[in-house]
């Protein structure tokens, strides 16, 4: 039996938060006023306002944007000129029916126009004097019913009004505009009038209605509320988003606006009064071990649609699964598919049917765990990266430094800072150079969730470098410390750490330019200084001690001739086992077709380094390559590799095949076609003689990637040595890289699977990149099947 996890009704079941709505009978729109108590101030003719108790409207307050004041005019018989046209203010409201006008002595009065109007707000103009203006909006959900069980959802809107501006006695009649009138009105007998418009939009409905309001000028105090106008009501669809604007015409200020998401059937206590809610399916969610069941309890004849999608905070939803179904159904999901933003939409397959949505996994711990397991960091360029995840994540990221040896990655905060991360948004690193020891840490709720060393694939494995932190103070003062697992050690220092012992040498390396600057700003800098040469010096002393010991041992053996042959035999076996443990040397040559292919080559080289192989590739020797030149660098590497009994790996790509064909036809390639780091181009001058003179077998091996190049596209001259396709022929490829006389290891298949797993993310990123396809894919002679589309 499935263990009940939680039960959710999308339509027919009660929700913990349900609304019991007031019912309105009849199809006509209506409006009424809710005035405040307005009384004159005796002889001074000043104004005061006393607020009456609010009517029982149960209106939810709405925070308004900046209001637009309504233009008001003066009317009456107090001897002053009445300004018509300009003395009116408009507010866009959906008001229906024919309202009633209350006498001025009672305070605020209102009337609703009989028909909708066109909403033409116009530009903002200065107010000529005191005006009635809307100050804020309130909304309430009600039901408009034709019968007891035939109702529609409706939105009641209340607009609160106040007097804005100041009453000034005009010096002449031009201040109020227009020609003189025969009758001049006094301010105490005048009235402020306004025309208020409500604009309502809810796809596919849009309405605009006009409301006339009026209040005696002698009964109001400027800046105080004069009451509110309530409009019944705007019909809207269940679950829709509505927008309401309120402004005056002419406009004197910005309009009020409000956006509201209406509930669907499961949020209403009166769903049985709304016909569109009757046909919705009943959905239960339950768990059974590692599976989650969506149980839809509907009749056998009913047709409905079911859709699963990722709800995005920014941007449209991402559909995951959609199907039209009939009758009762049980949909099974694996628990690994659950993420917090996974939502379910269900609807009957009928015209204009209500679609109900629910996101039941927002608070599920397993869903949050799956979300972080699915999240990935992607390096786009040297300084840009993004976080790829199904849902939005509250996260922050920082750079950290990871030293070899398994020590924790140390955050570089300070001098750098934590940055907020947005999913699928490109972020920039404040770096000058990349380094394989630099990693990215992503935290959420102060807990480490994700850590990746993004530069490891392109720049090689971790290096035994030390990171120096330079801090700059006033008056050009600066201090240096070395980042170590125990903390940042000041240089120079008398501490017993490795960086402290080599502090003077590190400072000399920094001054001589042997350290790589990774980051720089006004407050400090980060430097990566190599430690290889100091390790070599230490090992040189160890080897010297070993040689002295071997010499002494040889002398003893000579003195004991009977045992000399046995000792020599054991010594020979030790030397051979040491060479085998050290691994065979492999020189990897490739054509730098594009940056994506270089990252793919870097991933292959890094994976081979995990085996008993010593891999040399120009990606990891850019400094020596620039100093020596590509021709000299390749000749030195080739000579050293072949002298040690190693192997040269020719990694063929469309660009490499084109270069080889060019050399075979012309004997030389055009200058300037590639950059100074193209070791493959430089190697052709001595690789071709090895093949032409038959010296290549046993010393050279060819390889190409399955979906990028077919082996038949490799020139026939180079097929005199084995050419393997990767990763499909990885076991044979690794077997060819072993020592010639080394026995075939039973772990060869296991190592091939290890290399394949390490290589797969780089292959996926190259053949299925985020956004746009990677350049150079499937271009060139002999591109294999599917090379263009990555299938």
From Swiss-Prot:
The protein's name in its UniProt record: Interleukin-17 receptor C
Subcellular location: Cell membrane
Annotated signal peptide: 1-20
Residue spans, topological domain Extracellular: 21-538
GO molecular function terms listed in the Swiss-Prot or TrEMBL record: coreceptor activity; interleukin-17 receptor activity; signaling receptor binding
Main location: membrane
Organism this protein belongs to: Homo sapiens
Purpose: Receptor for IL17A and IL17F, major effector cytokines of innate and adaptive immune system involved in antimicrobial host defense and maintenance of tissue integrity. Receptor for IL17A and IL17F, major effector cytokines of innate and adaptive immune system involved in antimicrobial host defense and maintenance of tissue integrity. Receptor for IL17A and IL17F homodimers as part of a heterodimeric complex with IL17RA. Receptor for the heterodimer formed by IL17A and IL17B as part of a heterodimeric complex with IL17RA.
Keyword Membrane: yes
UniProt entry keywords in alphabetical sequence: Cell membrane, Disulfide bond, Glycoprotein, Inflammatory response, Membrane, Receptor, Signal, Transmembrane, Transmembrane helix
Gene that encodes it: IL17RC
InterPro entries reported in the protein's UniProt record: IL-17_rcpt-like, IL-17_rcpt_C/E_N, SEFIR_dom
Entries under Pfam families matching the protein: IL17_R_N, SEFIR
Compositionally skewed regions (Gly residues) per UniProt: 777-791
Bilayer topology: Single-pass type I membrane protein
Keyword Cytoplasm among UniProt keywords: no
Record-annotated membrane-spanning stretches: 539-559
Tissue: Expressed in prostate, skeletal muscle, kidney and placenta (at protein level). Expressed in brain, cartilage, colon, heart, intestine, kidney, liver, lung, muscle, placenta, and prostate. Also detected in thyroid, trachea and adrenal gland. Low expression in thymus and leukocytes.
Residue ranges that the UniProt entry lists as topological domain Cytoplasmic: 560-791
Disulfide bonds: 265-277, 341-391, 343-359, 400-409, 439-453, 481-488, 515-529
Noted disease: Candidiasis, familial, 9: A disorder characterized by altered immune responses and impaired clearance of fungal infections, selective against Candida. It is characterized by persistent and/or recurrent infections of the skin, nails and mucous membranes caused by organisms of the genus Candida, mainly Candida albicans.
A biological process term (GO) from this entry: positive regulation of interleukin-6 production
Matching PROSITE patterns: SEFIR
Any one GO cellular component localisation term in the record: cell surface
Induction statement: By HGF and VEGF.
């Amino acid at each position: 039996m499935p263990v009940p996890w939680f039960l959710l009704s999308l339509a027919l079941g009660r929700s913990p938060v349900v609304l019991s709505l007031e019912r309105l009978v009849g199809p006509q729109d209506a409006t009424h006023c809710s005035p405040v108590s307005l009384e004159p101030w005796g002889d001074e003719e000043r104004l005061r306002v006393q607020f009456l108790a609010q009517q029982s409207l149960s209106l939810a307050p709405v925070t308004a944007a900046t209001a637009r004041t309504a233009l008001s005019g003066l009317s009456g018989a107090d001897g002053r000129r009445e300004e018509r046209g300009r003395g009116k203010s408009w507010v866009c409201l959906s008001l229906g029916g024919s309202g009633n006008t209350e006498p001025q002595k009672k305070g605020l009065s209102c009337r609703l126009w009989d028909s909708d109007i066109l909403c033409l707000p116009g530009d903002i103009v200065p107010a000529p004097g005191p005006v009635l203006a809307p100050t804020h909006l309130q909304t309430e959900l009600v039901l408009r019913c034709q019968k007891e069980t035939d109702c529609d959802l409706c939105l009641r809107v209340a607009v609160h009004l106040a007097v804005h501006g100041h009453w000034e006695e005009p010096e002449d009649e031009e201040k109020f505009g227009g020609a003189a009138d025969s009758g001049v009105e006094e301010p105490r007998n005048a009235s402020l009038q306004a025309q208020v418009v409500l604009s309502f939009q809810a796809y596919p409905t849009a309405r605009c209605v006009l409301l006339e309001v009026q209040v005696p000028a002698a009964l109001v105090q400027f800046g105080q509320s004069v009451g509110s106008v309530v409009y019944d009501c705007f019909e809207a669809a269940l679950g829709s988003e509505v927008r309401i604007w309120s402004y005056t015409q002419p406009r004197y200020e910005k309009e009020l606006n409000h956006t509201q998401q209406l509930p669907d059937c499961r949020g209403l206590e009166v769903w049985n009064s709304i016909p569109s809610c009757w046909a919705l399916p009943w959905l239960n969610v339950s768990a059974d071990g590692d599976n989650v069941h969506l149980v839809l309890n509907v009749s056998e004849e009913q047709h409905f649609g079911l859709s699963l999608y990722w709800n995005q905070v920014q941007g449209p939803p991402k559909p995951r699964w959609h199907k039209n179904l009939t009758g009762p159904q049980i949909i099974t999901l694996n628990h690994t598919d659950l993420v917090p933003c996974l939502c379910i939409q269900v609807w009957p397959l009928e015209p204009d049917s209500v679609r109900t949505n629910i996101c039941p996994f927002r608070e599920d711990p397993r869903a949050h765990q799956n979300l972080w397991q699915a999240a990935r960091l992607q390096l786009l360029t040297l300084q840009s990266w993004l976080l790829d995840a199904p849902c939005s994540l509250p996260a922050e990221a920082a750079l950290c430094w990871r030293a070899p040896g398994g020590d924790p990655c140390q955050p570089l905060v300070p001098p750098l800072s934590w940055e907020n991360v947005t999913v699928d948004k490109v972020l920039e690193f404040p770096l000058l150079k990349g380094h394989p020891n630099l990693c990215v840490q992503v935290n959420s709720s102060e807990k480490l969730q994700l850590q990746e060393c993004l530069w490891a694939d392109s720049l090689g494995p971790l290096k035994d470098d030390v990171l120096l932190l330079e801090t700059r103070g006033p008056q050009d003062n600066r201090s240096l410390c070395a980042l170590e697992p125990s903390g940042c050690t000041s240089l120079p220092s008398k501490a017993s750490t490795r960086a402290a012992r080599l502090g003077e040498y590190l400072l000399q390396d920094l001054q001589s330019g042997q350290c790589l600057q990774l980051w720089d700003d006004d407050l400090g800098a980060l430097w990566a200084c190599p430690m290889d040469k100091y390790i070599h010096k230490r090992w040189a002393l160890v080897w010297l001690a070993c040689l002295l010991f071997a010499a002494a041992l040889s002398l003893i053996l000579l003195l004991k001739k009977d045992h000399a042959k046995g000792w020599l035999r054991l010594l020979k076996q030790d030397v051979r086992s040491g060479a085998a443990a050290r691994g065979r040397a492999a020189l990897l040559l490739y054509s730098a077709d594009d940056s994506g292919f270089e990252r793919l080559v870097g991933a292959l080289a890094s994976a081979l380094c995990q085996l008993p192989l010593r891999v040399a590739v120009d990606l990891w020797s850019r400094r020596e390559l620039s100093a020596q030149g590509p021709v000299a660098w390749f000749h030195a590497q080739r000579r050293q590799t072949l002298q040690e009994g190693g192997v040269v790996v020719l990694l063929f790509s469309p660009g490499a095949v084109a270069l080889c064909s060019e050399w075979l036809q012309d004997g030389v390639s055009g200058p300037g076609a590639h950059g100074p780091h193209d070791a493959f181009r430089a190697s052709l001058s001595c690789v071709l003689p090895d093949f032409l003179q038959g010296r290549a077998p046993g010393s050279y091996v060819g390889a190409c990637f399955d979906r990028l190049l077919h082996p038949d596209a490799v020139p026939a001259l180079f097929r005199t040595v084995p050419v393997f396709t990767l990763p499909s022929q990885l076991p044979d490829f690794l077997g060819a890289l072993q020592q010639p006389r080394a026995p075939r290891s039973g772990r060869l298949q296991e190592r091939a699977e290890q290399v394949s797993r390490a290589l797969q993310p780089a292959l996926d990123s190259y053949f299925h990149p985020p956004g746009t396809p990677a350049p150079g894919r499937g271009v060139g002679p002999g591109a294999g099947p599917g090379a263009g589309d990555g299938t």
